[in-house]
Design a protein with these regions (language model features):
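Short beta-strands within extracellular/lumenal beta-sheet-rich domains
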Residues: 31-42, 163-173, 281-286, 364-378
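Aromatic-lined ligand-binding clefts that engage carbohydrates, nucleic acids, or primary amines
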Residues: 48-63, 92, 172-195, 202-203, ...
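Short, surface-exposed beta-strand/strand-loop-strand elements in extracellular ectodomains
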Residues: 59-67, 190-198, 395-410
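Exposed aromatic-hydrophobic patches
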Residues: 78-85, 210-216, 283-289, 374
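Edge beta-strands of jelly-roll/beta-sandwich modules across compartments, strongly enriched
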Residues: 98-109, 233-241, 306-320
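Aromatic, loop-rich ligand-recognition surfaces of beta-strand-rich domains
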Residues: 262-268, 277-413
Length: 413
């Protein structure tokens, strides 16, 4: 049980930027950790408004006057938060954590923090929409090295502060040392340090709920543990286990993209393109006969090269009229006929998660055809696509014959 806490808002350093434009982690010479962006509301908004962050890499939390409002999770393709009534002088904070970096492939250029802009959208009395871009940002740098965590100002844990975002510190004594697993299920999201060593990251969503603690980094007598929790714990308590917990998934909301009883109806629809993909590994590019415009794009997989009843896609990009990749940040999966979420995290949004090693997969035994529908959030001109099958040798279950449908209106079910 932890007896000391260093609340986030009591331990903000001096701002590295006192006023200016939004900057990324790279602009601020930050490789990892968190940035807190702060600005002051200049115009009152009576009633509901929407805060849109373009783009938040990777996990952002929104606060007004220190009160938590909502989160923007890049993994879930989120970009907006519904805001309460805002008054002139209200302080808006956006607390952004960098989750990790990709060191290979085209996705290596992946800046962290808020990479473009922040806007407030609200409705006037005549029902017209107004977008305000927020400017003049303070930026606070919060590195994640042990020294920064140890130097924070700690205070005793009590009923009021035991669930706040920040650092939790405790000491414990050992008569004998050995390997163990630290159970982090009662904490939210963050990192663990033991005796000055960074042990690893945790996130309550799982499936991994424990961190491996090497016995060589423990010592007889007194040991120190610091937990940085960017979302706050349910209870500041951990325990050591003999065995790891690596299969306890706690996702929010539905994991799949097909409602109960929902079946795609393509009768009467005409494909804008049909073709055959090559077998084997590596990216493939397909160009349509002519560009088309629409919001929803459906890929219908008719079979696979391995002649089995399921298919896989690792990554998918759509190309504009100039052959350039369209931004995938506003994308969401409108529908997938089948997703394997039992043998692994292989749901349909893996086709645009920037991870070439993950993939969408249907379940074994579910017959073709298979369908995935991408919602691009607004009409776009699409002239083709780039597709990457699984990375394993031979690209198992890669799509062979396919059709593509594009519409401005949602497909029928």
């Amino acid at each position: 049980e932890f007896n000391e806490v260093a609340p986030l808002y009591s331990n903000l350093p001096e701002p590295s930027q006192k006023s200016g434009p939004l900057k990324t982690f790279e602009d601020m010479d930050m490789g990892w950790g968190c940035l807190l962006y702060r600005t002051t509301i200049q115009q009152a908004i009576d009633g509901e408004s929407i805060l849109k962050v373009t783009e938040a890499h990777d996990y952002a939390q929104v606060f007004v006057n220190g009160r938590y409002i909502g989160k923007i999770d890049r993994i879930r393709r989120e970009s907006t938060v519904h805001m309460p009534t805002l008054h002139v002088g209200d302080v808006l904070d956006i607390y952004v954590e960098a989750l990790g970096r990709i060191n290979f492939g085209r996705a290596i250029k992946d800046f962290k923090g808020i990479t473009e802009k922040v806007e407030l959208r609200y409705t006037l009395s005549d029902n017209s929409l107004v977008d305000i871009e927020l400017r003049d940002w303070q930026i606070f740098c919060l590195p994640d090295d042990y020294r920064a965590q140890a130097q924070m100002k700690y205070e005793p844990v009590n009923e009021k502060n035991q669930g706040v975002r920040g650092n939790y510190r405790a000491t414990f004594r050992l008569n004998k040392v050995g390997d163990t697993f630290i159970n982090m299920e009662k904490f939210g999201k963050g990192q663990v340090y033991v005796n000055g060593h960074a042990i690893g990251r945790f996130w309550q969503i799982g499936p991994q709920q424990t961190l491996y603690m090497p016995g060589c980094w423990l010592r007889k007598g007194e040991n120190e543990i610091i937990v940085t929790d960017v979302t706050g714990p349910r209870e500041p308590v951990i325990e050591g286990l003999r065995q790891p917990v690596i299969d306890r998934l706690k996702l929010e909301g539905p994991q799949t993209h097909r409602l109960q009883g929902q079946t795609l109806d393509l009768s009467g629809e005409q494909p804008i393109h049909a073709g055959t993909l090559k077998s084997g590994n590596g990216w493939q590019e397909v160009r349509f006969d002519k560009p088309v415009s629409g919001r929803y794009l459906c890929i219908e997989a008719l079979n696979s090269h391995w002649n089995r009843e399921y298919c896989c896609i690792s990554e998918l990009y759509l190309l504009d009229g100039n052959g350039k990749r369209l931004s995938r940040e506003p994308w969401s999966v409108a529908y997938a006929d089948d997703e394997d979420v039992t043998t692994g995290n292989k749901n349909a949004d893996k086709v645009f998660d920037l991870q070439e090693s993950t993939f969408w997969s249907t379940n074994r035994g579910v017959p073709f055809p298979h369908h995935i529908i991408i919602d691009m959030s607004q009409d776009q001109t699409v002239a083709g696509f780039q597709i990457l099958p699984r990375m394993e040798e031979g690209a198992p279950e890669s799509i062979k014959d396919y059709k593509v449908y594009v519409k401005s209106e949602p497909f029928r079910y």
